[in-house]
Amino acid sequence: MSQRKEKEFNIIEEIGYPAEVIQIIGRTGVHGEVIQVRVRVLEGRDKGRVLTRNVLGPVRLGDIVILRETEREARRLGRRR
């Protein structure tokens, strides 16, 4: 691997992995403060992988979020009673 590519990879590992929001699934949390979204990882070893994650704060389709890791996925939202 070239010096430049290796340096870029180290920066991505330190800061996080950028991912694009491709679908908003719904709200979760006691007060609805967390939004469950599907994201596509843009960089790193899992590039192109689609994950379900919980995001705190306002988010729209097409937004870029930074994931600290790409291993975990959020559980699916349950149906309300």
Swiss-Prot record:
<keyword id="KW-0687">Ribonucleoprotein</keyword>
<dbReference type="Pfam" id="PF01200">
    <property type="entry name" value="Ribosomal_S28e"/>
</dbReference>
<dbReference type="GO" id="GO:0030490">
    <property type="term" value="P:maturation of SSU-rRNA"/>
</dbReference>
<dbReference type="GO" id="GO:0022627">
    <property type="term" value="C:cytosolic small ribosomal subunit"/>
</dbReference>
<protein>
    <recommendedName>
        <fullName>Small ribosomal subunit protein eS28</fullName>
    </recommendedName>
</protein>
<keyword id="KW-0689">Ribosomal protein</keyword>
<dbReference type="InterPro" id="IPR028626">
    <property type="entry name" value="Ribosomal_eS28_CS"/>
</dbReference>
<dbReference type="GO" id="GO:0003735">
    <property type="term" value="F:structural constituent of ribosome"/>
</dbReference>
<dbReference type="GO" id="GO:0000028">
    <property type="term" value="P:ribosomal small subunit assembly"/>
</dbReference>
<dbReference type="InterPro" id="IPR012340">
    <property type="entry name" value="NA-bd_OB-fold"/>
</dbReference>
<dbReference type="InterPro" id="IPR000289">
    <property type="entry name" value="Ribosomal_eS28"/>
</dbReference>
<comment type="similarity">
    <text>Belongs to the eukaryotic ribosomal protein eS28 family.</text>
</comment>
<dbReference type="GO" id="GO:0006412">
    <property type="term" value="P:translation"/>
</dbReference>
